[in-house]
């Protein structure tokens, strides 16, 4: 869920981008062995040969979609002067804090936040 979490964090910090260092830095046999020296298995790529996807990529896509939804919601809530709902959204975004990850897993934070924005 870290791929989705980072997009929510970007929304919280009002960032307009995210740099992912590797998209397809494949090993010799990426479909058989995704280990890459000192990095975790699969960490060096989000797409596999032949256009295959992976959970890391799917989570990143979900996060990007949430980021865009948050951006649109913020604009609409400001335009409609729905300050109470906007404050609730800001409080949800505040839960995306690196130190919070020590206590609450990323997937739990993302799931709660998705429930909130999908209910608006």
What spans do the regions from the language model cover?
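Catalytic-core region of carbohydrate-active enzymes that cleave or remodel glycosidic bonds
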Residues: 1-39
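Catalytic domains of carbohydrate-active enzymes that cleave complex glycans
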Residues: 15-16, 31-120
